[in-house]
Structures are given as structure tokens and as C-alpha cells.
């Protein structure tokens, strides 16, 4: 679960500013170190998305709650940062209470986006199990859209953080390639 209390956070309110800054820095450093071994696979996903954008495809983010807000911020920055046309990168979010648990709402969001085989759909979900995001990625896969699910879950759960790349064939919708990259972040 993404909503667990971090063991080093028991007394955050009692820490001085310097100790708090050190704690946050240490945790950020652990996250960066955990990602490093998986950079080739992450780069593969980035290249696949970039190829689609260069070929006239679009990038659609799907996220709920804070993950959705982060996806929306990234989508808003893409035109200025990467020079893509406005509207090429879009975020579809579930921000109202309970929407994150609605798989059908995610499927509907993907349908409303008019996803097609030349597009990319990126799900962003802390738990890896957010129904809205999974529903959107299911619909995207059914439409032959390239999908990536970026997620984080703590090491205490059965599911570790991972990036999943599902390459689908526009001809028959079958999954040609699956890459699972285990990334345990934090503690």
C-alpha cells in the first residue's frame, strides 16, 4: 500500500529543521539509487514513447489523486520542455473521492481520449493497483496502444515498484513483449 506510515516518520514533528532536511535528503537518495540499475529499461520505454510522438502519435497520462496531479503537471510541461505541440501530451485524472476505485471510469477516460495504435498511454499509480489507472490501461491495450505503468509500492507488500512496458501489435492486439523492472524504493 502506498499509504503506509514510513518507519522513520514516527516523530517528524519533533525533528529540528536540519534533521528533517537530512531525513528527506536520505530518502530521496535511496529512491535515486533504487532506479539506477533499471535505467536501460526505463530508457526503452522513453524511446518507445518518443518514437510514437515523432510519428504523429500522442502521449496520454492516466492517474488518480496525487499521482494524477503529478501526471497533469508533467503533461503541462511537455510542450515547453520538449517542443511538442499543445494537445500532444494530455493527462486524464480522477481527482474526486472514490473515482480512483472506478475501473469503468478509467476505461471511459481512455475511450474518450480516442486512443489509437500510434499513441502511448502511461499510467501513474503509487500502489500499482489503482482501478481507474488499470481500467484505462486495459482499454488502451485493447485499442493497440503502447502502454507503460509507472508505480511504486513499498517493500513490505507482495508487489514491488515496477515499470511495465506492454508492446502491442496494431494488427492483432496481442502482447509481443513484456518487460517487468523491479524497483524497490525507500526504506
Would you name each region that the model predicts?
Residues 27, 55-56:
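Structured helix-beta-strand junction loops
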Residues 1-12, 50-53, 62, 70:
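Catalytic, metal-anchored helix/loop core of enzyme active sites in primary metabolism
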Residues 37-54:
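A short, well-structured juxtamembrane/interface segment
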Residues 59-180, 184-186:
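Glycine-rich phosphate-binding loops that contact phosphosugars or nucleotide phosphates
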Residues 12-16, 41, 98-105:
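Short secondary-structure boundary/capping elements
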Residues 1-38:
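Cofactor-/ligand-binding subdomain signature composed of acidic, glycine-rich
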